[in-house]
Regions:
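Alpha-helical transmembrane segments and immediately membrane-proximal extracytoplasmic
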Residues: 3, 7-10, 16-17, 22-497, ...
């Protein structure tokens, strides 16, 4: 993901920080938080904040807060992402050093231990460090005025870095959004903002984190409006824009100007093969709906199962992921099932990997592995796996067209894989504007925008028809959080298409029948 001398130096520095940061932060955790876990900064910082209140007008203070949030979120996102890359690089190096026989042990043990660490942290230390991170952000935003605790961000960083970096088949983007939302909220608390303004800092941090994680500032804006806020206002967009720009500058300064995927695809002129975006959209909608329903059903079954302790489940899923990943690696020579998997996805997108059996094995292995991880409650995100699924599905459709004699080259297959990424994102995440913007910014190829948009619309409409509630909101429902506060479902006209459980109240106040006024 990073290259060049500057990125090598940065990776070395990040490795040093990664080694000592948990110890330093853990020693100071109690001194920086009050009894409830909320931010409680030292008197020196309090005096600085008080001085700024006296010296700066309200507008200038707010501007300073947005700039600080962008800087802090950019640094947090880059450090977290590089930590994941470095940790998985260590796992790869150790497996290569161990040799053929012991490499299997390393590749199975690493995600097992990473899952164990994630499970212990998520059940014994900080329960909000488990899972993907987006649902926790939405719950804090709507139900707690966006007030996060410092320990939530810290333990999310540690748990998900260890889980994803050790090889569990998850992504870093959801945890990045969670960490940066908590960081922005903490800055708002530090400056003594009112609760409504602290709440407004959550989308600021979420957008800044996603911008730095993917190097996609425009997609970050769309995401917070589509998934988190549900509406656009001039006041909110100004702060989000500032933070997104600052975090993007931080990310590009530290890891480089290039896009996430450097593909070398040519500019495409309008051609008949772009009509394949329609079957790709249909396939992604079907697979995405099956994916969402499978996760939700297995989550419910996992809650009913008491035989395996909660803290042990991520370790067991990690062991299974290791076995699946090793099997796929032995059969294909590719390790894309493990961790983020962008290396193999890049090969497919650039047209260097066009063997259907290899692509299918990577797809199935990653699909099963992610479902195991998220059902077990392992700390990690969904964006990277979803993009991986879509890229592989799009490539398979493209290769099928080649085999049928349609006569296009490997670059077209790569373009169809890009379309698949956007379609799967729209199907599962349910953010259609974000879905095509994030693919465009990750690849910087504008010539496939029209088929990408058409495919995304097809995938989005079909997935909504087949499963009306998005994955995130369905998870919140399973957790007993009502959706009536969610902006996407405000207004009677939107409730008509939803099941009763989507708008019912879970926390009902009861009284004994014998009581009197």
């Amino acid at each position: 993901i990073t290259d060049g001398a500057s990125s090598d130096n940065f990776q070395g520095a990040t490795a040093s920080v990664l080694a000592v940061a948990p110890l330093l932060c853990q020693n100071r955790l109690k001194s920086m938080t009050d009894s409830s876990g909320s931010i409680a900064f030292r008197p020196g910082i309090g005096k600085l904040v008080e001085w700024l209140h006296l010296r700066l007008s309200e507008n200038k203070r707010q501007f300073l807060i947005w700039v600080l949030a962008g800087l802090a979120c950019g640094l947090a996102a880059v450090c977290y992402h590089e930590s994941v890359v470095i940790l998985f690089g260590w796992v790869r190096d150790l497996a290569a050093w161990a040799g053929t026989g012991w490499a299997v042990v390393v590749l199975v043990a690493a995600p097992t231990l990473g899952g164990l660490a994630s499970g212990l942290i998520g059940t014994k230390i900080e329960k909000n460090a488990a899972g993907g991170g987006i649902t926790q952000v939405k719950a804090r935003y709507y139900l707690h005025f966006g007030v996060f605790r410092f320990r939530e961000a810290f333990w999310r960083f540690v748990a998900s870095a260890l889980a994803v970096g050790s090889g569990n088949a998850m992504g870093p983007e959801g945890p990045t959004i969670h960490i940066c939302s908590a960081v922005a909220s903490g800055i708002g608390q530090m400056f003594g903002l009112a609760k409504r303004k602290i709440q407004a800092m959550v989308p600021v941090g979420a957008a800044a984190g996603l911008s730095a994680a993917f190097n996609t500032p425009m997609a970050a804006l769309f995401f917070v409006f589509e998934e988190l806020m549900g509406e656009v206002s001039s006041k909110s967009i100004f702060g989000i824009l500032i933070a997104v720009v600052i975090s993007a500058i931080v990310e590009r300064t530290l890891v480089g100007e290039h896009t996430l995927f450097i593909l070398g695809l040519p500019a495409f002129s309008t051609s008949w093969w772009m009509l394949l975006c329609i079957p790709i959209g249909i396939v992604c909608a079907a697979v995405g709906t099956f994916f969402v329903r499978t996760i939700l059903k297995l989550r419910l079954k996992a809650r009913e199962t008491k035989a395996v302790p909660l803290w042990l489940r991520p370790a067991l899923s990690g062991a299974l992921i290791g076995l699946i990943g090793v099997t796929v690696l032995n059969l294909t020579g590719h390790d894309g099932v493990f961790s983020i998997g962008y290396d193999d996805l890049s090969e497919v997108l650039s047209g260097r990997l066009l063997i259907p059996a290899v692509i299918a094995l990577l797809l199935v292995g990653k699909f099963i592995s992610y479902i195991l991880a998220t059902t077990a409650g392992t700390s990690g995100g969904i964006f990277a796996p979803v993009l991986f699924f879509g890229g592989m599905l799009g490539a398979l459709v493209g290769i099928a067209g080649q085999r049928l004699g349609f006569g296009y080259n490997e670059h077209v297959v790569g373009a169809l894989a890009l379309i698949g990424m956007g379609c799967m994102f729209a199907s599962v995440i349910r953010c259609p504007l974000t879905s095509f913007m994030i693919v465009f910014e990750m690849t910087n190829n504008y010539t496939i925008m029209l088929p990408l948009m058409v495919g995304n619309i097809v995938a989005f409409l079909l997935s909504v028809r087949w499963h009306p509630i998005s994955l995130y909101d369905s998870m919140l429902l399973q957790d007993g959080i009502t959706l009536k506060r969610m902006p996407a479902y405000q207004g009677d006209q939107d409730w008509h298409s939803l099941p009763v459980k989507a708008i019912m109240t879970f926390d009902v106040a009861t009284a004994d029948a014998s009581l009197s006024a």
